[in-house]
């Protein structure tokens, strides 16, 4: 089943009409959108329809006033807000943004903050005010910030001490930027101080009645396939989608969820904002300026955290610790997203903790697309099944759906009915949006195979597939095999030019410390034989290069494309 869009005047996916065309629509002419027996309202705002809903239940004594947000840092400071408090303080935040800052509905606000409570307040404040928030990682440098501010025409930026110098270095070149709002205990020339303004702000605020399809957020894609693009999401594609699919977590009002993710990554707003709060679940946040596996393990051991969500790398780093020293009395669910979960990681985690890691799969443009929910069986190497309301298929080069067992391009059906959860399009770039459509499908950019149970097996990024002597090889399969060897800490597999086979498999390998002194030629042979022993021999890496680290995007994804481009330039 699909959500049926019956409002032809709403901004179209293919044309990517901009915000000013959206909120000037005559609201009275909008008809409800039907899906089954449910109704999607013409207007929706997560702050009022979700946060204020739970707050009203707390006020009426119909809900326990437990924490909605539980925050801590490494210095022993802790903060807890229930939904009533969160509702009130986020209203104050909205008044800061629209009052002291003078921002107006539709203005774009860059939010570059670490995992501090103010990130959640500012995001909710933007929603309440009809502002478009644009999260960004604090790892950005001045060139990254300049690109985002200029391309988005942002009117304001909210930032902390981590990036103020980077912002000030480029702000004079951003003609649309009018407000710089600082989240800090200190003042800085040219910046308004958020904390000082918040103290004097009124808790009375009337939430803007945003149209469901009105622009709510802009996320910059990670740039693994070119310069970052601005993926625009609506209040509908973020908030309403979360109300539909949050059941995959199996959470409830008495649970606590910890998502370890950079605030600039879409996984953060999905796993540490939308999905838990829809269910009334407490969100746990640890500042963690630098990831420390021992701190994570201690927190999991001593705090009532039921559910953990993080990238596979987090689980791999935790597995490098002595897990026998820790017990997790409350933890019952572990989820992973952002990159492929290696079967070896899944098996090791289960062996050492008794817990299975369930994979979620998606992208900036679609949010969560596939998942292995708590009620589904875990199949190593598989992403799970499509999440409601998505129809995900594997298609061929003509856009035809392939039968189970056949490899093709993973794609999401968007015609004739566009599902809720789909982004509005790439801002100011309708051609790029249209170029990603094949027939009735939006290409997810990955190769995969669908089995008879509807589970998807990830083969690799579309441009990562290696074709060697007619054999099509997914890099993740080789990476999975290499990661099973104790010498390998991290690896990336790409194609490398070869005069006979056209291209062959090459592995870049980061070694474990105890293997750094080993003879590299001998170790290469050992790893090659190991791969041959655990997967089809034709997949083994004919070339191996040992490196100290791998290139990554600012959100932590390995940039295979960068490795491949350099390899083909120097060896081709």
Curated annotation (Swiss-Prot):
Residues that hold substrate according to the record: 364, 472
Induction per the UniProt record: Down-regulated in kidneys from a strain of spontaneously hypertensive rats (SHR). Down-regulated after unilateral ureteral obstruction or unilateral nephrectomy.
Example of a GO cellular component annotation carried by this entry: mitochondrion
Residues binding ATP, per UniProt: 221-229, 359-364, 446, 461, 557
Subcellular location: Mitochondrion
UniProt cross-references to InterPro entries, sorted A to Z: AMP-bd_C, AMP-bd_C_sf, AMP-binding_CS, AMP-dep_synth/lig_dom, ANL_N_sf, Mitochondrial_ACSM
Enzyme Commission designation: 6.2.1.2, 6.2.1.25
Residues in the signal sequence: none
Cofactor names: Mg(2+); Mn(2+)
Pfam families per the UniProt record, alphabetical: AMP-binding (PF00501), AMP-binding_C (PF13193)
GO BP terms: acyl-CoA metabolic process; fatty acid biosynthetic process; medium-chain fatty-acyl-CoA metabolic process
Tissue: Detected in kidney, in proximal tubules.
GO molecular function: ATP binding; benzoate-CoA ligase activity; decanoate-CoA ligase activity; fatty acid ligase activity; fatty-acyl-CoA synthase activity; medium-chain fatty acid-CoA ligase activity; metal ion binding
Keyword tags: ATP-binding, Fatty acid metabolism, Ligase, Lipid metabolism, Magnesium, Metal-binding, Mitochondrion, Nucleotide-binding, Transit peptide
Presequence positions on this chain: 1-46
PROSITE patterns: AMP_BINDING
Reaction(s) catalysed (UniProt annotation): a medium-chain fatty acid + ATP + CoA = a medium-chain fatty acyl-CoA + AMP + diphosphate; benzoate + ATP + CoA = benzoyl-CoA + AMP + diphosphate; hexanoate + ATP + CoA = hexanoyl-CoA + AMP + diphosphate; butanoate + ATP + CoA = butanoyl-CoA + AMP + diphosphate
Residues involved in CoA binding: 139, 469-471, 501, 532, 540-542
Main location: mitochondrion
Family: Belongs to the ATP-dependent AMP-binding enzyme family.
Quaternary structure note: Monomer.
Job of this protein: Catalyzes the activation of fatty acids by CoA to produce an acyl-CoA, the first step in fatty acid metabolism. Capable of activating medium-chain fatty acids (e.g. butyric (C4) to decanoic (C10) acids), and certain carboxylate-containing xenobiotics, e.g. benzoate.
Protein name: Acyl-coenzyme A synthetase ACSM2, mitochondrial
Organism in which the protein naturally occurs: Rattus norvegicus
């Amino acid at each position: 089943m699909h959500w049926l869009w019956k409002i032809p005047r709403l901004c179209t996916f293919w044309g990517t009409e901009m915000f000013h065309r959206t909120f000037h629509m005559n609201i009275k002419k909008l008809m409800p959108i039907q899906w089954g027996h449910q109704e999607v309202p013409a207007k929706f705002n997560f702050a009022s329809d979700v946060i204020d809903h739970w707050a009203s239940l707390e006020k009426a004594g119909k809900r326990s006033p437990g924490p909605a947000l539980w925050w801590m840092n490494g210095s022993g400071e802790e903060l807890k807000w229930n939904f009533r408090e969160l509702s009130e303080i986020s209203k104050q935040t909205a008044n800061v943004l629209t009052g002291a800052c003078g921002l107006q509905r539709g203005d774009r606000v860059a939010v570059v903050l670490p995992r501090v409570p103010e990130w959640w307040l500012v995001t909710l404040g933007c929603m309440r005010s009809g502002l478009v928030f644009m999260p960004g990682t604090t790892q950005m440098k001045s060139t990254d910030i300049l690109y985002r501010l200029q391309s988005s025409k942002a009117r304001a930026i909210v930032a902390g001490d981590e990036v103020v110098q980077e912002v000030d270095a480029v702000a004079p070149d951003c003609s649309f930027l009018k407000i710089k709002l600082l989240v800090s205990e200190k003042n800085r020339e040219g910046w308004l101080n958020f904390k000082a303004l918040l103290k004097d702000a009124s808790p009375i605020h009337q939430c803007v009645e945003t149209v469901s399809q009105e622009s709510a957020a802009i996320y910059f894609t990670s740039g693994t396939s070119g310069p970052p693009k601005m993926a625009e999401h609506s209040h509908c594609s973020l908030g309403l989608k979360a109300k539909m699919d949050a059941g995959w977590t199996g959470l409830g009002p008495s649970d606590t969820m910890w998502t370890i993710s950079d605030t600039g990554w879409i996984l953060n707003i999905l796993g540490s904002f939308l999905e838990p709060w829809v269910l009334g679940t407490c969100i746990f946040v640890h500042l963690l300026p630098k990831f420390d596996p021992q701190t994570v393990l201690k927190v999991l051991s001593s705090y009532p955290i039921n559910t953990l969500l993080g990238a596979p790398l987090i689980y791999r780093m935790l597995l490098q610790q002595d897990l026998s020293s820790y017990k997790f009395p409350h933890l019952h669910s572990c989820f992973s997203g952002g990159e492929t979960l290696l079967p070896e990681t899944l098996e090791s985690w289960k062996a050492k903790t008794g817990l299975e890691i369930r994979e979620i799969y998606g992208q900036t443009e679609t949010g969560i697309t596939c998942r292995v929910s708590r009620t589904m069986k875990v199949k190593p190497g598989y992403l799970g099944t499509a999440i409601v309301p998505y129809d995900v298929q594997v298609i061929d080069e003509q856009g035809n759906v392939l039968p189970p067992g056949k490899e093709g391009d993973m794609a999401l059906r968007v015609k004739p009915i566009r599902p809720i959860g789909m982004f509005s399009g790439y801002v100011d770039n309708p051609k790029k949006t249209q170029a990603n459509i094949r027939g009735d499908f939006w290409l997810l950019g990955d190769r995969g195979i669908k089995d008879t149970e509807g589970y998807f097996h990830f083969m690799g990024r579309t441009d990562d597939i290696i074709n060697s002597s007619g054999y099509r090889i997914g890099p993740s399969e080789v990476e999975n095999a290499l990661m099973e060897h104790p010498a390998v800490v991290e690896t990336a597999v790409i194609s490398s030019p070869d005069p006979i086979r056209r291209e062959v498999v090459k592995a870049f390998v980061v070694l474990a410390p105890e293997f750094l002194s080993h003879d590299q030629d001998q170790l290469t042979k050992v790893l090659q034989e190991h791969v041959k022993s655990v997967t089809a021999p034709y997949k083994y890496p004919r070339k191996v290069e040992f490196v100290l680290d791998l290139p990554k995007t600012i959100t932590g994804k390995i940039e295979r494309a960068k490795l491949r481009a350099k390899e083909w330039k120097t060896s081709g």
